């Protein structure tokens, strides 16, 4: 979700972060149907680093540039195969589907916040022992425990 805190407007779509070099490099290039927003977290607040290109884009997108305090410094609907640089230095860039700017009623100086959509990992069952050394593995009254693949590496018991 992306919120224009100044206007009290919200966009209830999926939000992903581009907070690494590779994620920022990939961006939304070659995405056929842009149905989510991508928030670029830049390493420094500058105009040059906040410049974007629309090469290899398959559709137009809305772009919002924010300074380090999350205030809008520039915004526009970006067309395919063009270059864009914000009017002022920016630390964050929000790219999303056309209509995002209209929905949020964005104007320069607005305060914008976002909540990244949690990406759920595939779950794997994990064998476990209950405290007190009671093993419920194989028991009819067992407790099924599941943890994220990223968080737990299941060991064979």
UniProtKB/Swiss-Prot annotation:
Top-level taxon of the source organism: Archaea
Pfam family, one: DUF192
Family to which the UniProt record says this protein belongs: Belongs to the UPF0127 family.
Name of the protein this chain belongs to: UPF0127 protein TK1120
Organism: Thermococcus kodakarensis (strain ATCC BAA-918 / JCM 12380 / KOD1) (Pyrococcus kodakaraensis (strain KOD1))
């Amino acid at each position: 979700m992306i919120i224009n805190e100044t206007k009290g407007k919200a966009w209830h779509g999926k939000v992903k972060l581009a907070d690494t070099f590779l994620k920022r490099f990939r961006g939304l290039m070659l995405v056929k149907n842009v149905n989510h927003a991508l928030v670029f977290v830049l390493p420094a607040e500058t105009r040059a680093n906040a410049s974007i290109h629309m090469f290899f884009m398959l559709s137009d997108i809305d772009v919002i540039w924010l300074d380090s305090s999350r205030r809008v410094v520039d915004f526009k609907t970006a067309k395919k195969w063009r270059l864009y640089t914000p009017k002022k230095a920016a630390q964050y860039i929000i790219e999303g589907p056309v209509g995002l700017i209209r929905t949020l009623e964005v104007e320069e100086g607005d305060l914008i916040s976002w909540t990244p959509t949690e990406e759920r990992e595939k779950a794997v069952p994990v064998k476990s022992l209950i405290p007190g050394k009671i093993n419920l593995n194989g028991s009819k009254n067992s407790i099924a425990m599941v943890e994220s693949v990223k968080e737990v590496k299941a060991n064979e018991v």
